[in-house]
């Protein structure tokens, strides 16, 4: 092998490594990919006068690429039991947008009270399976007691016959919430009727517009199992939603749509322009069915827009029983 060429090859890789490590971008792996394509491949002679095509390049570059790739990836624990990391103020819901805060207050958002993260996940378009937005579901800090006040042993014995007496009331309630879609809808709807305040933070992972966001909300609400029994009332509510969501135009990736469920059942919509850090209160829907059906779909049922957000939220609710 030509030692001079080999030395030049290693120097080129060293320069690439140094450049990417000093890059202001946090994604050193992407930096390496861009720069490596500009490095010209060279042939090196192998044993018995044969030609070994590019093997030193591939061997060295593979080691370097692997190092940079795993340096940029978060460490994942398959055995983790807590979906909410301790000693942090935010959590990554999707790598393409800003992390979601664990707490939302009136100091940083146009909301009426303090909210704690309940669950989070991503919304995928079912047919094509590409991501649309990241979703965070929040519960008002002062309303956490409503969970155990509403879903208790008295409630369990009053409304359900299939109670396993060998299990605690909490275990029975947890089983119904997690494994029975029809009963979980009833339980979550009763929780929402108690005046429990909630908030949804929707952050697009690709550029979109207000029309698509509104259409997505209407579709989610319309999939609630009680829609057929409330057609007239819901139709008026969706008309209110259309008026409250009258803003037109584009919504950039990483902007936020904030939907607050108020104590009286009304919904308040706000928009956060993340680039300029500006907020706008868009409007309010006073029809209680709209807010109830929307958050019910987020939290339960077989047609939830984000199964991951539903699961993490239910797991957290169970800890409050």
Curated annotation (Swiss-Prot):
GO terms for molecular function: intramolecular lyase activity. It is found in: Mitochondrion. Its main location: mitochondrion. Pfam families: Chalcone_2 (PF16035). Gene3D superfamilies: 3.50.70.10. Residues 1-72 form a transit peptide. GO terms for cellular component: mitochondrion. InterPro entries: Chalcone_isomerase, Chalcone_isomerase_3-sand, Chalcone_isomerase_sf. Keywords: Mitochondrion, Transit peptide. The keyword Transit peptide applies. Belongs to the AIM18/AIM46 family. This is Altered inheritance of mitochondria protein 18, mitochondrial. The gene is AIM18.
């Amino acid at each position: 092998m030509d030692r001079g060429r080999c030395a030049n090859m290693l120097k080129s890789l060293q320069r690439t490594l140094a450049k990417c490590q000093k890059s202001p971008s946090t994604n050193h792996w992407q930096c390496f990919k861009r720069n490596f394509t500009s490095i010209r491949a060279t042939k090196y002679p192998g044993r018995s006068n044969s030609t070994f095509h590019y093997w030193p390049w591939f061997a060295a570059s593979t080691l370097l690429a692997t190092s940079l790739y795993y340096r940029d990836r978060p460490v994942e624990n398959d055995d983790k039991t807590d979906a909410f990391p301790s000693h942090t103020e935010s959590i990554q819901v999707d790598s393409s947008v800003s992390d979601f805060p664990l707490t939302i207050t009136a100091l940083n958002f146009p909301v009426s009270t303090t909210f704690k993260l309940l669950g989070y996940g991503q919304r995928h378009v079912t047919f094509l399976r590409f991501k649309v937005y990241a979703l965070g579901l929040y519960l008002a800090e002062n309303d956490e007691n409503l969970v155990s006040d509403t879903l208790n042993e008295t409630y369990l014995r009053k409304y359900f016959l299939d109670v396993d007496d060998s299990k605690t009331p909490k275990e029975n309630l947890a089983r119904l919430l997690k494994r029975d879609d029809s009963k979980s809808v009833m339980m979550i709807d009763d929780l929402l009727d108690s005046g429990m305040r909630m908030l949804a933070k929707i952050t697009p992972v690709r550029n979109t517009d207000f029309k698509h966001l509104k259409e997505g909300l209407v579709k989610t609400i319309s999939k609630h199992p009680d829609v057929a029994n409330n057609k007239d009332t819901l139709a008026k509510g969706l008309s209110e939603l259309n008026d409250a969501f009258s803003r037109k135009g584009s919504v950039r990736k990483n902007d936020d749509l904030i939907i607050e469920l108020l104590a009286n059942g009304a919904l308040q919509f706000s928009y956060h322009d993340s680039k300029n850090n500006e907020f706008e209160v868009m409007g309010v829907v006073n029809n209680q069915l709209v807010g109830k059906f929307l958050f019910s779909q987020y939290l339960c049922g077989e047609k939830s827009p984000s199964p991951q957000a539903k699961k993490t939220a239910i797991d957290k609710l169970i800890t409050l029983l």
